[in-house]
């Protein structure tokens, strides 16, 4: 394969949009993604969950967002390689080699949009949890709301995911019980208000005690008080453990494993840029909408800092399409 202008590692929302914008600017671009499906977390973990904080979209599901991004990407020339895990990134004589488990591709610049890395859900921590998960009694994310239709569901967690999923489940489930070990929730204030005004049964401060057949027992924190009710399914929203893998030698990362970026979204390695949840800098906000802007910033920076042997287009779509 001939040398590219840009290789993007990661085909989540930020990576897909970055590829579109790079192509719009006239860069030859390829995206490499380890999963078999593009779209990152919104597509693979919560395709039916509504996302509210993307400009111009009052609400969009993870699946529809991915569909829209792929349609947008189809407007420009690009290569998308799915099911390829990047193992190492090397640089020699100003050219990057992106080495995967299937190939070795070369480019003048690399943009990392790998998100939070490999994700592993935090579990309840009970003895028979794996068996209950295999039986479909315990889940950590939802790919189809139909599985919960007419069911009594208990959601464990106190953040935005637990709150959002409780509201989504209320539309299809028979009963929704939201369980949090603290009295106050960590989610967005507006979402907390919506939950409190809904028919969701909120149990705070309670923790898991026992689950036998369909009987769920909760224990009140710092009190000798238990609750019991019938539950068909448990959804655990305790977040995810991340495993960021350093792909390039001497690449500077922060304590949380994310890549340190300067004001141009460039790492300490010239030509190696980062955007989205994979990046870290002072004042970083881990929001998808912020990641889109970071990707644009990185691509505009590389068009100025690197030498390309062909003319580039301007940064305004109205002058291109």
Swiss-Prot record:
SUPFAM superfamilies: FAD/NAD(P)-binding domain (SSF51905). FAD binds at residues 33, 41, 46, 86, 119, 277, 318. Its cofactor is FAD. Signal peptide: none annotated. Homodimer. Belongs to the ferredoxin--NADP reductase type 2 family. This is Ferredoxin--NADP reductase. It comes from Lactococcus lactis subsp. cremoris (strain MG1363).
């Amino acid at each position: 394969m001939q040398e590219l202008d840009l290789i993007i590692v990661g085909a989540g929302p930020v990576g897909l949009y970055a590829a579109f914008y790079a192509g719009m600017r006239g860069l030859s671009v390829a995206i490499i993604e380890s999963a078999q499906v593009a779209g990152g977390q919104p597509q693979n973990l919560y395709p039916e969950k509504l996302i509210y904080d993307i400009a111009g979209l009052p609400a969009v599901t993870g699946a529809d967002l991915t569909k829209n991004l792929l349609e947008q990407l189809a407007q420009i020339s690009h290569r998308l390689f799915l099911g390829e895990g990047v193992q190492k990134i090397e640089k020699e004589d100003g050219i990057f080699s992106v080495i995967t488990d299937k190939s070795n591709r070369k480019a003048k610049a690399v943009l990392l949009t790998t998100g939070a890395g490999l994700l592993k859900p935090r579990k309840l921590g009970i003895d028979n949890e794996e068996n209950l998960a295999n039986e479909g009694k315990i889940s950590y994310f939802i790919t189809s709301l139909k599985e919960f239709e007419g069911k009594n569901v208990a959601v464990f967690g106190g953040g935005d995911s637990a709150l959002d999923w409780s509201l989504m489940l209320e539309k299809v489930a028979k009963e929704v019980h939201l369980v949090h070990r603290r009295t106050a929730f960590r989610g967005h204030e507006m979402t907390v208000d919506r939950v409190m005004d809904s028919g969701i049964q909120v149990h705070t401060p309670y923790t898991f005690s026992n689950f036998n057949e369909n009987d769920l027992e909760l224990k009140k924190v710092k009190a000798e008080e238990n609750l019991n009710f019938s539950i068909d399914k448990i959804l655990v929203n305790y977040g995810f453990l991340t495993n960021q893998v350093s792909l390039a030698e001497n690449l500077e990362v922060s304590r949380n494993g994310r890549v340190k970026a300067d004001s141009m979204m460039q790492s300490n390695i010239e030509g190696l840029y980062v955007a989205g949840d994979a990046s870290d800098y002072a004042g970083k906000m881990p929001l998808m909408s912020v990641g889109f802007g970071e990707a644009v910033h990185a691509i505009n920076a590389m068009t100025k800092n690197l030498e390309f042997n062909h003319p580039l287009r301007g940064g305004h779509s109205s002058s291109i399409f």
